[in-house]
Amino acid sequence: YECTVTEAYKTISSDFFYTLVDEQYYEALEKEITKRRYISKDTGKLINEKNSFFCVKIHLKYTGSQPTNMTFYTTGYSRQTDNLMYDPGLLEFIDKALANEEKDVLYLEPGKEYDLWFFYHVLGTYSNDNTYYIQGDFQNYNDHDSYNGYLIELNNLIELD
């Protein structure tokens, strides 16, 4: 597959998700948000406001020769001012996979292109001094200590709150 990040946002509000996904996913999105104990039922915001959500739009072209149900393994990383890499970001779900039981599995057809929103829960305080990435080798499950695939830098990450 080939992929590029086309948009990326940082927010503490799950209400912002509704502005990104197609209306057909609203009901499934609401169920997912309701399940998360770290999101306030009253405000829709993260209870621990030191944490954040990264909403990352990825344009993906599936270059495989056969249709597949692809499980996306991806983590968020940050390079902090000490120049060390940390893995504070966890993929919660992908917009087009919300209707599936597995929120990170998509059916892909050869030669087709997809615009997908990936929603990450990111632990720890956000800083403009850090550089943020997502794991770009979506099919390479890793133990986070030994990942050796490529990283996609989240350039122009727009901070909303």
What label would you give each PLM region?
Residues 1-161:
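Conserved functional micro-motifs across diverse proteins
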